[in-house]
Regions:
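A contiguous loop/helix-start segment that scaffolds small-molecule binding in enzyme catalytic cores
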Residues: 82, 161, 165-281
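Short, hinge-like loop/turn segments at secondary-structure boundaries
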Residues: 53-56, 75-77, 101-104, 128-133, ...
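Short active-site oxyanion
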Residues: 30-36, 109-113, 161-162
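Conserved helicase motor
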Residues: 61-66, 141-142
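Glycine-rich, flexible N-terminal cofactor/catalytic loop recognition
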Residues: 4-62
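A glycine-rich beta-strand to alpha-helix segment
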Residues: 78-123, 169-173
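Class I SAM-dependent methyltransferase SAM-binding "motif I" and its flanking Rossmann-like core
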Residues: 100-158
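Glycine-rich, highly charged phosphate/nucleotide-binding loops
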Residues: 65-73
């Protein structure tokens, strides 16, 4: 029996590919809610139809939602209605909309109730074969040179598994970037987790990149990338920050020379690394 108290707000994970991963508690909670707050109506209606939940009132909350939308949800809770949040797939707030809403509700004394459930982040991690004692989630692999430099500063943390997402149309370019900058790292690409065509590719970046080049069908689907580098791998974190500071002031070659002088990084490797930042703005 679930006790629905006044001013409770539920965070409800949904399957990332296999409907059987929806928990019994999640289904019961969805059934009992007065209003289900969703990222997109179309995808959530498909889920509701599959789990045989009919006539459920739905509200949209996504990246375009405003402070007025958050206030509207709080007003509904104050009126005694019970609400819960789902994303299109997986656990809400993990690379999905919702942080501002949850923070706002907490600040207004709403009891936020998290339900455990599916997420591609830990699903990929536990089957990766990479260390699980320390890990970080970095969202999506960045597109711009400036954002890549900051992202690589995070990847340069030693002895920690980094987890991030990539889309089908950018996966090969991202693997090329990783191979160029971290050829000795350990890499796992998890494709279509929990779905029929689930697949794990494990090894050095060059090996995995070659597999994608040989089989174009690999590039379709959704990807979780898991990355690990140990103490023996050259640290470019300070060089990346230097590039971020000087990229609009000095030629790339000059920044690479300065990096070698300041941080003892190999000048040629640093130069190639900076080129990869610049050519994929």
């Amino acid at each position: 029996k679930i006790d629905f108290l006044h001013m409770n707000f539920y965070i409800i994970p949904t399957p990332i590919g296999n409907l059987n991963d929806l928990t019994k508690r999640a289904k019961i909670t969805i059934e009992k809610l007065d209003i289900l707050i969703v990222e997109s109506k179309q995808k959530s209606r498909i889920l509701l139809e599959k789990i045989n939940v009919k006539d459920k009132k739905i509200m949209i909350y996504n990246d375009s939602s405003s402070a007025n939308n958050r206030k509207g949800i709080l007003d509904i809770l104050k009126a005694g209605k019970v609400c819960g949040l789902v994303s299109d797939a997986g656990t809400p707030l993990l690379s999905d909309p919702g942080f501002k809403l949850i923070r706002y509700l907490i600040d207004n004394y709403v009891n936020v109730v998290p339900l455990p459930g599916p997420t591609s982040i830990t699903t990929g991690l536990i089957a990766s074969g990479l260390p699980t004692d320390k890990f970080q989630f970095l969202g999506f692999f960045p597109k711009t040179a400036k954002d890549k430099a900051s992202f690589y500063s995070e990847l340069n943390r030693k002895n920690i598994t980094s987890i991030f997402f990539e889309s089908s149309h950018r996966i090969q370019k991202t693997l090329e970037d990783i191979f160029l900058n971290y050829p000795n790292s350990e890499l796992v690409v998890a494709k279509e987790l929990t779905k029929i065509h689930e697949k794990f590719l494990r090894g050095k970046p060059e090996k995995i990149l070659n597999e994608f080049k040989l089989d174009k069908n690999l590039s379709s689907g959704e990807f979780v990338i898991l990355f690990y580098k140990d103490d023996a791998v050259e640290d470019f974190s300070k060089a990346d920050l230097l590039f971020n500071l000087l990229r609009n002031k000095l030629p790339i070659k000059e920044i690479a020379k300065l990096s070698e002088k300041l941080f003892k990084n190999n000048k040629n490797k640093t130069y190639k690394r900076y080129l990869s930042f610049s050519k994929r703005n």
